[in-house]
Amino acid sequence: MKNFILSNNEARLVVLQRIELISPFLKKLRKFFGRTLFTNFVTKYFLNSNQIGISYYAAMHKEFLTFQNSINSDQDQLFLSIGGGLGGLELIINQNLPSKKYYFIERNFISKKVKYGWGGTINNEAYNDLEIQKRFLENNGMHNSQINIFDYDKDKLPDQKFD
């Protein structure tokens, strides 16, 4: 697999989480129309989900290569992802080290206006939908028994040691 299979809704969430994956034309549209219109209109109707799937896969694979040698394939069994988006990086890990368990802690809403960065301020923004995330993981090869998703604002968070 050299790309992720993305529905339009999944591609939208990927773009809201990783703006660098959009085309130069969409970057110009975003700059011209502003973040609110881009978030609520352009990302719903003008994304190429196939191209986003290719770009997202490449970005996650490149990231995986930076720490691949730090994972012990025999000992590391439980992976924790906090605010990791849809889980593309975890899918790459799963392709290379199958049969692990993944725990995702995410917020479950999509902000009206995208705000990127940290800048020392409290960031109450979120760009995820946990049902869409689960469907994305399953459609791209992660088995349901490997997936544990927690809503940061509503669920009791996991209390165990992670690898």
Residue ranges and their predicted role:
Residues 142-153:
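Conserved SAM-binding strand-loop segment of SAM-dependent methyltransferases
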Residues 101-142:
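Class I S-adenosyl-L-methionine-dependent methyltransferase module
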Residues 75-85, 103-106:
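Conserved class I S-adenosyl-L-methionine
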Residues 71-72, 94, 102:
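N-terminal cationic-hydrophobic initiation segments that often serve targeting/anchoring roles
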Residues 152-163:
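A short acidic, Gly/Pro-enriched loop at the edge of an enzyme's catalytic core
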Residues 2-74:
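Class I SAM-dependent methyltransferase Rossmann-like catalytic core
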